[in-house]
Amino acid sequence: MDKFVKLTGVAAPLPVVNIDTDMIIPKDYLKTIKRTGLGTGLFAEARYNEDGSPNPDFVLNKPAYQNAKILVAGDNFGCGSSREHAPWALLDFGIRCVISTSFADIFYNNCFKNGILPIVVSQEDLDKLMDDASRGSNAVLTIDLEALEITGPDGGSIKFEVDAFKRHCLLNGLDDIGLTLEKGRSIDNFEKATAASRPWA
């Protein structure tokens, strides 16, 4: 998993509440267990017209936001089913950070396990960030996970909080497998000691 230390990029505004995982990645795209290629299906029902052409009114299709790395969204982001394809699709598109006033628990935890930083802010701070994100190509935010700070295009900053363990994992690029591998020497020592004490096993 890629480390997340500091991210600077365009933030796209998505002022919609209760965005569920089916909206993030529709069920038609759940036939694969690969984490790549899902970016094309991200918000597919809103991004594409019925004939498959891009919907010019959807924010991620607008020229200023086609390479967005940050999403500023309404309350209760990631609700609905627990599909892990939702963070996979966001990451494959290029989104590394989602900012909202609240997240569904399963989606929130899945983000950390896949290298995405979900940030919870107050409604007042979200309003400011939504305004920043509405500036098109000038909507550049910097997310500093070490300093726990969001810096806007005008230099203003907002502090945020993240669980210390989850922060450690993102800063060091550790998913569940990476965390296990950190204990590799201890695991090897345990297996050798077990083999020596129980040679018949």
UniProtKB/Swiss-Prot annotation:
GO biological process: L-leucine biosynthetic process
GO MF terms held by the record: 3-isopropylmalate dehydratase activity
Entry EC no(s): 4.2.1.33
Keywords: Amino-acid biosynthesis, Branched-chain amino acid biosynthesis, Leucine biosynthesis, Lyase
SUPFAM superfamilies per record: LeuD/IlvD-like (SSF52016)
GO cellular component labels: 3-isopropylmalate dehydratase complex
Keyword Nucleus assigned: no
Reactions catalysed: (2R,3S)-3-isopropylmalate = (2S)-2-isopropylmalate
Pathway connected to this protein: Amino-acid biosynthesis; L-leucine biosynthesis; L-leucine from 3-methyl-2-oxobutanoate: step 2/4
Broad EC category: lyase
Record has Lyase as a keyword: yes
Role noted for this protein: Catalyzes the isomerization between 2-isopropylmalate and 3-isopropylmalate, via the formation of 2-isopropylmaleate.
Protein name as it appears in the record: 3-isopropylmalate dehydratase small subunit
Organism from which the protein derives: Sinorhizobium medicae (strain WSM419)
